[in-house]
């Protein structure tokens, strides 16, 4: 079952910890997901595409922030976590990115301002037991201003906002400067009362930030494609017959949603072939060529990442995708 339905149908009580601490659960946000006007489910090709675009070099995604906006004041996004992790591992400098082996699907519920430039994002995930879980961390973003605060571990566990910096990876660091993270108030109260020592605080903060911090670049890349002409392919899922059968059997109806694909890269490569490789001159050693973004006014040119140096990988017709915003 999709994560959006697991959250919408969630009725489990919030997790209760020793000493009576009641913490937010997925069921607290069931109504918000059910009433969300825009629910998007990302196809595998789009998950791969947005991750590649997010970490492209050149002017980088951060040079296109003025073109990005959240398309609705309330948005639900959902993706298959295994596909996202596979896409990150395929990017050489992201191979060591923290990944969760527990999550099956990951989703975010975004509340944005009318312009779609600032907002807050809450993360959810499902495990293989078909249970929905709510993250302890909230993500605030502002695409017009740098909002990254200094790192203060003790203050962060008390509910203050915290930033994530990656100076060794400029493409990601620029995006993260527009993002800050903070614990849900109930979780902050719980951790503050736990009286953790410095090493425990550091370990905990790494755990809660480890996977969530790397969602935002992919999401921003998605919204860039969303704003571009013909950047995405939308398919409204028709659940009328299925839901009729579910109601007749006493089950909850599934939520309408839109499946989103990325057709923009399909025409840029020929199928892989080993034909005529003997006639080709010997090329350089096989190596990875990183994606590259160049912007010319309202047009963005994205040079796709690719492998170079081995003809057996196929004949490439073009590796440049043009995104137009007018």
Where are these regions (language model features)?
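Arg/Lys-rich, low-complexity, intrinsically disordered basic segments
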Residues: 237-326
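Intrinsically disordered, low-complexity regulatory segments
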Residues: 1-271
């Amino acid at each position: 079952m999709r994560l959006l339905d697991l959250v919408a149908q969630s009725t489990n009580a919030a997790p209760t910890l020793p000493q009576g601490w009641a913490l937010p659960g997925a069921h607290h946000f069931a109504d918000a997901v059910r009433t969300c006007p825009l629910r998007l489910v990302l196809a595998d090709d789009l998950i791969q595409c947005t991750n590649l675009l997010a970490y492209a070099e050149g002017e980088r995604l951060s040079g296109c922030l003025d073109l990005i906006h959240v398309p609705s004041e309330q948005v639900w996004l959902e993706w298959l976590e295994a596909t996202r992790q596979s896409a990150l591992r395929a990017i050489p400098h992201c191979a060591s990115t923290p990944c969760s082996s527990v999550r099956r699907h990951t989703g975010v519920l975004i509340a944005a301002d009318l312009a779609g430039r600032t907002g807050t994002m809450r993360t959810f995930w499902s495990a293989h037991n078909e249970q929905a879980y709510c993250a302890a961390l909230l993500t605030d973003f502002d695409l017009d201003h740098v909002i990254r605060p200094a790192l203060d571990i003790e203050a962060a566990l008390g509910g203050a906002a915290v930033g994530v910096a990656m100076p060794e990876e400029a493409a990601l660091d620029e995006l993260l400067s527009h993002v800050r993270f903070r614990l849900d108030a109930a979780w902050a109260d719980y951790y503050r009362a736990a009286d953790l020592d410095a090493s425990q605080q550091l370990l905990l903060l790494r755990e809660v930030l480890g996977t969530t911090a790397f969602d935002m670049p992919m999401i921003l890349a998605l919204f860039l494609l969303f704003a571009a002409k013909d950047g995405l392919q939308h398919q409204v899922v028709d659940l009328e017959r299925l839901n009729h059968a579910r109601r007749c059997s006493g089950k909850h109806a599934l939520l309408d949603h839109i499946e989103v694909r990325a057709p923009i890269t399909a025409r840029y490569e020929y199928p892989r072939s080993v034909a005529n490789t003997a006639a080709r001159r010997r090329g350089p050693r096989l190596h990875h060529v990183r994606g590259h973004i160049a912007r010319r006014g309202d047009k963005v040119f994205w040079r796709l990442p690719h492998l170079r140096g081995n003809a057996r990988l196929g004949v490439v017709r073009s590796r440049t995708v043009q995104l137009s915003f007018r």
